[in-house]
């Protein structure tokens, strides 16, 4: 590892610039994986909708009433139940198989990236990265947000199956036509199926794919850092207004490798990563985005000149935020938290709990009633 001040400075600069650029690639790669899995789900949902429409049309009114009460008393009702159950099993196979393959490939790539990251920052020989299979197995044996990755994905088909049953039963009870039931379940093509009950599954696939990939990446980094003798890591959050208050508050926090400490992902869709620290202040440049949604969703003619730029990599998120216009600060914090921040002396990290959850206004008031009474009594 670097052993003089200038070498540490250069090493830290190389590392932070490389890892912040890499996280952009990771987000795009995750988007591609989400798109593949959602497209596969949409195909399965289309097949289900077609078969359901045919089956429902063949049911007598008495059979529809029985289905709504959870009774499968005829061959046609049993056939409908089997159709839904088998479809849910097909969904489970598709989701778990596709994601497992993707995560194992990612594990190997990320371990290689972490090794290259350290190798480019230091002089001398660097050990080989852990094998992809070993990293993947390690990630599967570690919880992410308190759950195992496999369990998180197994819940998707179970919940989706429940949604299908519930939507059909509710539709029958409400007197909807079969066509209306199918439309409410799947949604409409004109709205890209976002108006259907099954949009929950599409969103959950998005959430879990991004979260599980973030988990595998960070396990790959940690295993590789430890194998290479890195002693300390630092949390590196994304500098934009999409970041959560928890990640904004812990940007720059350091941890000893090989000890029990908090690890990303800190929440669903978390973009924070842990970079190797060489005992020096973080140097170089890191990008920022003054936006509350992805840049790709903002028309070019609506992007201010200073919306995208760079700051010193040693700048922590709260320091960057303190220099932003009051209008942006208020929008990100909300009016009450903004007053606490500007006049109550609150730091960003005070708006979240130790587990990463954002504290509600009521919880903040209960914790610091004196400040609330002073600030908001003055305002009234």
Language-model regions, residue ranges each:
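Acidic, glycine-rich two-metal-ion catalytic cores of nucleic acid-processing enzymes
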Residues: 182-185, 191-290
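N-terminal leader/targeting and assembly helices and adjacent pre-domain segments
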Residues: 1-191, 285-380
């Amino acid at each position: 590892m670097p052993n003089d001040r200038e070498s540490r400075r250069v090493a830290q600069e190389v590392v932070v610039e490389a890892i912040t650029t890499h996280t952009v690639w990771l987000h795009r790669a995750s988007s591609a994986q989400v798109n593949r899995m959602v497209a596969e789900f949409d195909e399965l949902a289309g097949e289900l909708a077609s078969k359901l429409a045919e089956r429902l049309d063949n049911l007598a009114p008495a059979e529809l009433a029985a289905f709504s009460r959870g009774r499968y008393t005829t061959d046609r009702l049993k056939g409908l139940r089997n159709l839904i159950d088998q479809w849910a099993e097909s969904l489970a196979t598709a989701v778990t198989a596709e994601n497992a393959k993707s995560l194992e490939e990612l594990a190997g790539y990320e371990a290689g990236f972490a090794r290259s990251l350290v190798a480019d920052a230091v002089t001398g020989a660097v050990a080989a990265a852990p094998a992809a299979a070993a990293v993947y197995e390690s990630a599967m044996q570690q919880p992410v947000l308190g759950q195992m990755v496999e369990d998180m994905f197994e819940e998707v088909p179970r919940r989706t199956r429940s949604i299908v049953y519930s939507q059909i039963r509710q539709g029958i009870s409400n007197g909807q036509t079969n066509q209306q039931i199918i439309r409410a379940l799947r949604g409409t093509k004109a709205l890209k199926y976002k108006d259907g009950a099954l949009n929950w599954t599409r969103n959950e696939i998005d959430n879990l794919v991004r979260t599980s990939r973030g988990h595998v990446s960070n396990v790959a980094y940690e295993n590789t850092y430890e194998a290479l003798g890195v002693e300390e890591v630092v949390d590196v959050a994304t500098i934009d207004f999409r970041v959560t208050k928890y990640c904004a508050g812990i940007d720059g926090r350091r941890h000893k490798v090989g000890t029990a400490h908090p690890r990303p992902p800190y929440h669903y869709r978390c973009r924070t990563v842990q970079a190797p620290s060489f005992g020096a202040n973080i140097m170089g440049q890191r990008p920022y985005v003054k936006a509350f949604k992805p840049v790709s969703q903002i028309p070019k003619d609506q992007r201010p000149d200073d919306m995208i730029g760079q700051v010193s990599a040693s700048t922590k998120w709260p320091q960057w935020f303190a220099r932003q216009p009051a209008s942006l600060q208020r929008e990100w914090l909300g009016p009450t938290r903004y007053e606490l921040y500007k006049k109550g002396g609150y730091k960003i990290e005070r708006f979240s709990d130790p587990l990463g959850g954002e504290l509600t206004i009521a919880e903040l008031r209960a914790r610091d009633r004196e400040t609330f009474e002073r600030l908001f009594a003055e305002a009234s």
